[in-house]
């Protein structure tokens, strides 16, 4: 009876460990910082609106993305976050100047950098 109980205990511990590992892995893959997730969402919106020629909407979403990216920077250091912040700043500057195509390129570059944050 004892070997069966030991086997069941070991299986239970193994399943528990796998479950914890899976939870941790999905947490890091999904992005551990909610501000990064919001920055990605708004950078995507900025790029989408820029592609439609909507400079004002691009600027609005890029500004929100920038606020979230700067908030994330308080919690983490990442070169992609720094690059994303710089690109969002450029997107805002060019969008306000009416350079929608250039602003869109910067918003898309920001999005690519933000998506690289693990």
Enumerate the language-model features and the residues they cover.
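Bacterial Sec-dependent N-terminal signal peptides
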Residues: 2-11
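Long, charged/polar, soluble alpha-helical segments
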Residues: 5-6, 22-118
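Bacterial N-terminal signal peptides
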Residues: 10-23
């Amino acid at each position: 009876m004892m070997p069966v109980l030991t086997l069941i205990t070991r299986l239970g511990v193994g399943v528990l460990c796998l479950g914890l590992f899976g939870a941790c892995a999905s947490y890091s893959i999904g992005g551990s910082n909610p501000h990064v997730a919001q920055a990605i969402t708004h950078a995507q919106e900025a790029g989408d609106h820029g592609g439609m020629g909507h400079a004002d909407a691009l600027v609005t979403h890029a500004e929100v993305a920038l606020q979230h990216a700067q908030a994330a920077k308080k919690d983490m250091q990442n070169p992609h976050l720094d690059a994303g912040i710089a690109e969002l700043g450029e997107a805002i500057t060019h969008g306000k100047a009416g350079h929608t195509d250039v602003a869109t390129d910067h918003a898309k570059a920001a999005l690519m950098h933000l998506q690289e944050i693990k």
